[in-house]
UniProtKB/Swiss-Prot annotation:
Residues 18-40 form a propeptide. Keywords: Cleavage on pair of basic residues, Disulfide bond, Knottin, Secreted, Signal, Toxin. This is Conotoxin AbVIN. Residues 1-17 form the signal peptide. GO terms for molecular function: ion channel inhibitor activity; toxin activity.
């Protein structure tokens, strides 16, 4: 029974992987736009206005100014 379950799960994983690869080939523009959106995110430099620590390169936002 365990062997059958392992084979079933392996087959499901292979099917999902093949489906994802096929989807990437059909819609390459979506893949590029998601890659570009990741590359375009940047952190705020010193003395720029911020709202939270994670937006600053230094991870320090005090009184809405990056330090």
């Amino acid at each position: 029974v365990i062997i059958i379950a392992v084979l079933f799960l392996t087959a499901c994983q292979l099917i999902a992987t093949a489906s994802y690869a096929r989807s990437e080939r059909k819609h390459p523009d979506l893949r590029l736009s998601s890659r570009n959106s990741k590359l375009s995110k940047r952190c705020l430099g010193s003395r720029e206005q911020c709202v939270r620590d994670t937006s600053c390169c230094s991870m320090s936002c005090t009184n809405n100014i990056c330090f």
